[in-house]
Amino acid sequence: MVDELGSNSEVGTLKVVILHRPGTELRRLTPRSSDQLLFDGLPWVSRAQEEHDQFAELLRSRGVEVLLLSELLTEALHSGAARMQGVAAAVDSRRLGIPLAQELSAYLRGLDPVRLSHVLTAGMTFNELPADARTDVSLVVRMHHDADFVIEPLPNLLFTRDSSIWIGPRFVIPSLAMRARVREASLTDIIYAHHPRFTGIRRAYESRTAPVEGGDVLLLAPGVVAVGVGERTTPAGAEALARSLFDDDLAHTVLAVPIAQRRAQMHLDTVCTMVDVDKVVMYANVVDELTAFTIERQPDGVTISDAAPFVEAAVRAMGIEKLQVIGTGIDPVVAEREQWDDGNNTLALAPGVVVAYERNAQTNARLEAAGIEVLTIGGSELGTGRGGPRCMSCPVARDPLP
């Protein structure tokens, strides 16, 4: 077990990571609900589990300690305070009405940690409400279809990158932008607040008022953080995070990187990820377009520069001579296909060693030609939620870079 937790880069040797093995929450997806729950298709769940098990086993084979979110949550829910917190976040009295909310809350508080953990992640339909949680005076119960959700499932828990971020020795619980994902942050909050593994570790970014998501946050180098601003993270969120990191001495420079507000580029890590201390894989169609506003800590406050080309701004902030950009292919059709299939969304296990989906053959070949070791996993079903190995992992501990 690794005792010292934290991370100051994207590529330091990975020691501890949080994953979430997909389960019942994915089986809840239907053609009627998939758009609302942010999935582009209906995954074959058993195959998705096989692919995820392969991913987890690959990490373990490389010496990474894999923590599973559902197990951490179950262990944290032995705390009475954690149970109260989880139930309060899951039961929406504005949607359910006071009578049903009260009965449901009382029922959930009486569940054992394993069962409560399952409900908090997989959700619950009206048909699954036990008799003692049904109230005859609830119009909500009478008017809802049995298959409707009294507690909505969280299929996007698969993407543990977004709901918590480790920067230096601290963690950030962000504010997620999409309604279908808001409650995910409450579960990571419970884990970090009540699981003994994280006792004494301090939180960063206390505000959590403006949306910031982990997929938009890249630790380019010690003290240098890039934050994508687009569909999920707002300018206000990026600025609030930057000022918080400066106040806590966790960064000296933050690059705010505007990205297109569309599904294919929902986060910065869908178009760009670090694969070595001075190498980045980037979607070819944005290489010449990506810019950055440089936010720097100063003795008397902060300064914000005008937008400059992203690579130039990154090189200057990182204090290196060159940042090698590895493109995703010359053929624009292949590049677009592989970007959609998360070809740029790699997880670094060490400098120059990454995990990638096997289906992105051209991107992987270009990485290997640039001297990067590429470890591949299947992702035909995992990718239906538009996330790759980086999206599916929350690094909790990496060896620090100097």
Swiss-Prot record:
Q: What is its main location?
A: cytoplasm
Family stated for the protein in its record:
Belongs to the arginine deiminase family.
Q: Which gene encodes it?
A: arcA
SUPFAM superfamilies reported for this sequence: Pentein (SSF55909)
Q: Extract the PANTHER family matched here.
A: ARGININE DEIMINASE
Which species is this record about?
A: Mycobacterium ulcerans (strain Agy99)
Single annotated GO MF = arginine deiminase activity
Q: Which residues form a coiled coil?
A: none
Q: Which UniProt keywords apply?
A: Arginine metabolism, Cytoplasm, Hydrolase
Report the locations given in the UniProt record.
Cytoplasm
Taxonomic path: Bacteria, Bacillati, Actinomycetota, Actinomycetes, Mycobacteriales
Query: Looking at the Swiss-Prot or TrEMBL record, what is one Pfam family this protein matches?
Result: ADI
Q: Name one GO cellular component term.
A: cytoplasm
InterPro entries given for it?
Arg_deiminase
- Looking at the keywords, is Cytoplasm present? yes
Which residues constitute the catalytic centre?
A: C391
Q: In which pathway does it act?
A: Amino-acid degradation; L-arginine degradation via ADI pathway; carbamoyl phosphate from L-arginine: step 1/2
The UniProt catalytic activity note for this protein reads: L-arginine + H2O = L-citrulline + NH4(+)
Q: Name one GO biological process term.
A: arginine catabolic process to ornithine
Its Enzyme Commission number(s) read 3.5.3.6
Q: Identify which top EC class this enzyme belongs to.
A: hydrolase
Q: What is this protein called?
A: Arginine deiminase
What's the superkingdom here? Bacteria
